[in-house]
Regions:
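Viral structural modules
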Residues: 2-3
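Domain-terminus/edge residues, biased toward the C-terminal soluble/receptor-binding domains
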Residues: 170-171, 185-295
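Structured C-terminal helix/loop/strand segments within mature extracytoplasmic catalytic/sensor domains
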Residues: 10-13, 28-58, 64-71, 75-79, ...
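A short, sequence-level motif marking secondary-structure junctions
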Residues: 15-19, 77, 132, 240-241, ...
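Bacterial N-terminal signal peptides that target proteins for export
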Residues: 6-18
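Hydrophobic core
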Residues: 20-28
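Active-site-adjacent loops and short helices of periplasmic peptidoglycan-processing enzymes
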Residues: 35-199, 204-209
């Protein structure tokens, strides 16, 4: 009896994380033709109810209420994490700045690669509006604008991101960029692990004094704003498809770079508990880039 109950529990947990992966493949969160990984394909079988294959190279399912890891695959392997980085950028901005502050666009920010808001040097925006741009549309120029506003430079902001990671007890996470573009510095490459990415998300949605604001931003379907000069209006659509496709989904962030592949971190409420899933290296496009691409989503 007890063994059957444990088996059902294991199958449920793996089924939950596989549900995320299936939605990624089928419902357009990532392109269907690319959701496979070339190595480390692990067959997971628990009794008669075999959930199938989990193709993400690294994956974690966490009970966010307790911090307990319910399922793990290569959870401590360091990998680049693409735009899932932006959950750290967002929570630091919420904790360290007034949402009504004015943020100016530098030449460096305006020159960032797609995906971008499309700003020009000298424009000014309300910080709160930029957080929606950051989290809904994953704009790379917005991330740099916030980093420069909060810390004076991208490099200094990366130092502050790493300091926050250390405060959270994360020893395998290193930030180089605020937007998740592939990069490296004296501390090594831009990287995390599936477990530590899940722990960052747990902090954002469960522990941060600004968790309510974080959930509000990441939970809306769309948002519209203008620059402070009212010269242009911008519309943002939330690309976290799980908000409408999976019951109980409350927050999440997608990502992709040439080195990271497709990545995702998200939170959902199920049976009065909060769960977090982190997926790294879910796959790459079948038609690989002929040269390194800076694109991040």
């Amino acid at each position: 009896m007890h063994e059957k109950r444990r088996e059902r529990g294991r199958t449920y947990r793996v089924g939950l994380i596989l549900g995320f992966c299936l939605l990624i493949a089928v419902n357009g969160l990532f392109p269907v033709s690319c959701v496979y990984a070339e190595e480390e394909q692990t067959k997971i079988a628990y009794g008669e109810n075999t959930p199938g294959q989990l193709y993400a190279r690294s994956a974690v399912l966490m009970d966010a209420d307790s911090g307990r890891i319910l399922f793990a695959k290569n959870a401590e392997t360091e990998r680049p994490m693409a735009s899932t980085t932006k959950i750290m950028t967002c929570i630091l901005a919420l904790e360290r700045a007034d949402p009504d502050e004015s943020v100016s666009v530098s030449a460096n920010a305006a020159a960032q690669p797609r995906v971008r808001l499309g700003t020009v040097e000298g424009q000014k925006f309300k910080l709160k509006d930029l957080l929606y741009s950051l989290m809904l549309e994953s704009h790379n120029d917005t991330a740099v604008m916030l980093a420069e506003h909060l810390a004076g430079s991208v490099e200094q902001f990366a130092d502050e991101m790493n300091q926050k990671a250390r405060e959270l007890g994360l020893s395998h996470t290193h930030f180089v960029t605020p937007n998740g573009l592939d990069g490296a510095d004296d501390g090594g490459s831009h990287r995390t692990t599936a477990e530590e990415l899940a722990r960052i998300m747990r902090y954002c949605v469960m522990e941060s004094p600004k968790r309510k604001e974080f959930l509000e931003i990441t939970g809306v379907s769309s948002y519209q704003f203008s620059d402070l000069e009212q010269t242009q209006t911008y519309s943002c659509i939330n690309h976290n498809a799980f908000l409408t496709m999976m019951e109980g989904a409350i927050s999440g962030k997608t990502g992709f770079t040439g080195e990271a592949g497709y990545c995702y971190v998200g939170a959902l409420k199920r049976e009065k508990r909060t769960f977090i899933v982190a997926l790294l290296a879910c796959g790459w496009p079948c038609l690989l880039y002929t040269s390194p691409s800076p694109r991040d989503t």
